[in-house]
Regions:
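Juxtamembrane "helix-exit" motif on the non-cytosolic side of transmembrane helices
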Residues: 61-65
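Membrane-interface extramembranous regions at the lipid-water interface
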Residues: 2-51, 84-100, 117-137
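Selective recognition of hydrophobic, aromatic-rich stretches within alpha-helical transmembrane segments
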Residues: 23-24, 66-86, 99-121
Length: 137
């Protein structure tokens, strides 16, 4: 029984460390809110998108409890606008594309699907015109 408790405790510590690491990537993107240079790995981009969705759901719940119509969700998305654009531009740089590719999302349906396809691509190996490969750092 003692051994099971020790293993369980170590497993919980490992899970906590992994959660903190994922949250750290979200915070790192917020710190780089005005950095449109360089590259962003898939993990950095998608962890930011994941936590952004989680916090938007929480903001929506708060809106529902208070009876407001999208006030907190709207404020949250407004606050996340520049960090989201910055990490998206860096994500495009990682696959060797210009940040201007973000405008493809303005093409209904097909543009958003193409952008999704681009964001799930692995970054270019080695250096490219936008900087060093963040995977190697």
């Amino acid at each position: 029984m003692q051994q099971f408790i020790e293993i369980n405790t170590k497993y919980q510590q490992l899970l906590t460390i992994k959660r903190i690491r994922k949250m750290k990537e979200y915070i790192d993107v917020l710190k780089k809110w005005k950095d449109f240079d360089g590259r962003a790995r898939r993990r950095e981009y998608w962890m930011f998108v994941l936590f952004m969705a989680i916090f938007a759901i929480v903001a929506g719940i708060i809106d529902g409890i208070l009876g407001t119509v999208c006030v907190f969700v709207g404020l949250y998305y407004l606050a996340m606008l520049l960090p989201m654009i910055a990490v998206s531009v860096r994500r495009m740089h990682d696959i060797g594309k210009s940040g201007w590719w973000l405008f493809i999302t303005f093409v209904p349906v097909i543009g958003s699907l193409w952008y999704l396809f681009l964001t799930i691509q692995d970054g270019q190996p080695g250096s490219n015109q936008y900087g060093e490969n963040p995977k190697g750092v």
